[in-house]
Amino acid sequence: MQRAAFKVALSAIAVAAAFASTAHAAGFMLTEQSAGALGRAYAGAGVDGTDLSGVYYNPATMVLHKGTAIQMGFVGIGLNLDYVGEDGTTANGRNKSQAIPHGYIVHQINDKVWFGLGMTVPFGMGTEYDDDWAGDEHGISATILTFDLNPNFAFKLSEKFSVGVGASIQYASADLKIRKNITEQVQTAVNGIQPGAGDAITDASVRSEIDADSIAWGWNVGMMWSPLENLRLGVSYRSKITHDAEGDLSIDELSVTPGSIGPLDLTQIIGTNLTENGLYGDMTGAATVTAPAWAMASVAWDVNDLVSLYGTFRWTDWSSFDELKIDGDGKNVSTIPNKWRDTYLGSLGMDLRLTDWWTLRGGIAYESSPIANPQYRTAIIPDADRWWFAFGSSFKWSDNFQTDVSFAHLHGVHERNIYNDKGAKEGRFRKLDAYLLGVQMVYKF
């Protein structure tokens, strides 16, 4: 009962916060946990000290903040997934624009210990096509949502060195809709009723939809070293979190070509074979979704009172997301192979402090795609290598109050084709772009 109530509470918080349903970072990872750091393409994230997002990126950097402070903000996202098939048909997997919320609290307990709490949406995605679009066997729609509650402690070991550690309680929900080819199974079912009749069937498919959720745990750790007063180096790590999600699975809308098979109708086919073998009907669904581990190294150099330079390198363990397996009533219904590889992000950025209250920033980043073999690219996660181009600004209205606004354009490059299960090219994404707008406020008590 307590677990169910907690799931409802976390779900309500995430929905009320206008959860993200857009995939744009590599895989379905959401880098966007700070609207301020977005303005420099997340270069220096965690060690920059300009906001409280170090709670997420590197908890050791909480020692940069005195007293108590809070931060709230969001990053709004719009997609352009422009697809054209080999036959000239077009589609666009853009979902309605959504917002990724984030919130942080940092409190200095004493001269050596800090406490921080992060509320983030670290993984999420959402793509949606028409039910009858040409690539429906690659996916019709998909939404993955995570909400992460992350308490942390930081310890200042010396004037130059600090460490941080935290735990994550993470709620995840997944809704996946896909049309699955079951031609061989239907041929077998029909031949079992009327021998030889199934040989005339050239195509058969059903629509599968699973809606499942889960709660799981993880941990994170970080370190920061300041060899010089104006130079900070940080490394951090977040563990993978495996969600064994359970919920409802519905398989319906059987489509058979040709539609007429002698004296047989679809009702006979469904009732005789498909339902008994877990290929049709409503059942208990289960899916395993892995939020991968990642490690990050960042540097911040305050060159002078006017300029600060930043850099970040991040590795993400996407090779752990080898396949997406969906079960119904304990039987495997579908397995979607991913064969993903680890990804890397490198970014460089700069802050320019024009006045005591106005700072401009900009950054550029390159991020690799987890898709090792383009034949495993799906329309629901149509990933590709991408460039980030970002700029932003901070406004310090008083010693206690600051606002940040940032914009970024993510542009997908290189191979963007879609293939069928026989290895033939079905089409390509002419554009894989995302547009991000972030706004946040920081208040110090």
Positions of PLM-derived features:
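Gram-negative bacterial Sec-dependent N-terminal signal peptides
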Residues: 1-24
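N-terminal amphipathic/basic helix or basic patch
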Residues: 10, 31, 35-38, 50, ...
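Residue-level signal for alpha-helical transmembrane segments in multi-pass membrane proteins
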Residues: 16-21, 60, 74, 362, ...
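Outer-membrane beta-barrel porins/channels
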Residues: 24-41, 45, 87-90, 97-445
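Transmembrane beta-strand segments of Gram-negative outer membrane beta-barrel proteins
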Residues: 29-44, 63-80
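Periplasmic N-terminal accessory/gating domains of Gram-negative outer-membrane beta-barrel systems
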Residues: 46, 51-56, 60-62
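Mid-chain, structured segments of secreted extracytoplasmic proteins
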Residues: 72-99
